[in-house]
Amino acid sequence: MEKPSREAFEGNNKLLIGIVLSVITFWLFAQSLVNVVPILEDSFNTDIGTVNIAVSITALFSGMFVVGAGGLADKYGRIKLTNIGIILNILGSLLIIISNIPLLLIIGRLIQGLSAACIMPATLSIIKSYYIGKDRQRALSYWSIGSWGGSGVCSFFGGAVATLLGWRWIFILSIIISLIALFLIKGTPETKSKSISLNKFDIKGLVLLVIMLLSLNILITKGSELGVSSLLFITLLAITIGSFSLFIVLEKRATNPLIDFKLFKNKAYTGATASNFLLNGVAGTLIVANTFVQRGLGYSSLQAGSLSITYLVMVLIMIRVGEKLLQTLGCKKPMLIGTGVLIVGECLISLTFLPEILYVICCIIGYLFFGLGLGIYATPSTDTAIANAPLEKVGVAAGIYKMASALGGAFGVALSGAVYAIVSNMTNIYTGAMIALWLNAGMGILSFVIILLLVPKQNDTQL
C-alpha cells in the first residue's frame, strides 16, 4: 500500500492515541516515582538525597533541552523526533530496571528527561500540522489530558503498581506503552518546517545552561551532606554563579539565543512564565506528602497515592472551567483565584501535627483544593503567555514557557526533598514535612504576588 503524502494526510484517532501514549510515558510513568521514594531508598540501598536527584533529574533534563529539541523537530522532522523520544524512553526504562545500581537509576532517569524533551514539542507540532479546526481543539484537549491527567494520576498510579506488582513494573508497563505508541505512529508522513532558519543553534548557551542547572541541582540535593564549608560545595557554588553570569551575558549578545530575554520586557508574559515556574514547583508537595505518610504514618505507597485522587479529579474537571473563566473574566482573576485556592490546599496538607484521622481528612480536602487551583490557573496562564508574544516569536515563547514548567517541577521536587531531609534529621519527620510543605505554600504566595503585580486586568497588551 502506498504511503500517503503529507498534503493528503489528515490526523486520525490512531495517530492521536499514539501521541497521547507517547506523552504519558513522561507525565504518568516517569513522574510516578514521586510516590515510591522510600521503596527506592531500600531497593537501591541509598540515601534520600541520591533518590531525590533521580526523581528530579528527569524534569530537569526535559526543561533544559525542550527548546533545542523543538528546533530539531522543525528541522529534521517531528515524526522522527517523536520516535527518537519514544526509543529513548525505552532505553532509559531498561537501565532503571536491570540493576540495583544507583548510577544506572540516575542515568536512566536522565535519558527519560531527554525523551520527554523530544516528545513534547514534536507531538504538539504534529497536532498543529495534521489536525484542523475542531479536530485540532479536540486533539489538543486529549494532549492536555495526557499531560495534566498523567501528572494528576501519577502519584496514585505509582503507588498502586509498586504495591501490587513491584516498582519495576512501572517501567515495564512504560516500555509496553512505548512500543504500542511506535506502532500507532508508524506510517504517518513526515512533517517539517517549510522555512528552516539559517541561524546556528545556540550550543554555547545550552552548554552553560546544563552546567549551571546540574551544579545547582547537586547543591540543593547534596548540599547538607557535602557541608557548606567543603571545597566541593564552594566549587559547585562558584560554577553555578559563574555559568549563570556568563549565560546572561552571552544570551543578550547572541543573534539566535536559546532564551530570548527580550520577551521578558512584556510584564504579562513575565508574570505568566514566572508564576508558571513557581506553581510547577509545588510538585514538591507530592514527594514530601507521600514520603511522610509512608515513613511517618506507616502507609503503603498505594494508600499514600489514594489520598491524592481528589487532585486528579479536580484538575481534569477544572481545566475546562478555567477556560470558561478566561473567556468571561479575562486572564488575571482566574490566575489569582486558582493560585489562592492552591495555597489553601497547601496549608491543609502541611498540618502534619494533627492526629492521623484528622490529617487524612485535611489531606483529601487539601488535594482537592490543590487540583482545583491548578486546573483554574492552567489555561489562563498559557493563554496569557502565548497571547503576549509577538507572532514571529510564538514558538520560542511557548518553548520558554514549557521550559519554565519542567524546570519548576524539577527544582520544586529537589528543593522540597532536600528541606524535608535536612529538617527531619535536625528534628523529626513531622516537622520536616511541615516545613517542606510550607516552602511549597511560600512558592504559591510568591506566585500570587507576581500575578498581582505583573499580569494586566485585560490581556490586550502585546509586545
Curated annotation (Swiss-Prot):
GO terms for cellular component: plasma membrane. CDD domains: MFS_MMR_MDR_like. It is found in: Cell membrane. Pfam families: MFS_1. GO terms for biological process: response to antibiotic. The keyword Nucleotide-binding does not apply. GO terms for molecular function: transmembrane transporter activity. Gene3D superfamilies: MFS general substrate transporter like domains, Multidrug resistance protein D. Keywords: Antibiotic resistance, Cell membrane, Membrane, Transmembrane, Transmembrane helix, Transport. InterPro entries: MFS, MFS_dom, MFS_trans_sf. It is a multi-pass membrane protein. The chain crosses the membrane at residues 17-37, 53-73, 86-106, 107-127, 142-162, 165-185, 201-221, 230-250, 273-293, 299-319, 334-354, 357-377, 403-423, 435-455. Multidrug efflux pump that acts independently of NorA and is one of the factors that confers resistance against diverse quinolones and chemical compounds. PANTHER family: MAJOR FACILITATOR SUPERFAMILY MULTIDRUG TRANSPORTER MFSC (PTHR42718:SF9). Belongs to the major facilitator superfamily. TCR/Tet family. This is Quinolone resistance protein NorB. It comes from Staphylococcus aureus (strain MSSA476).
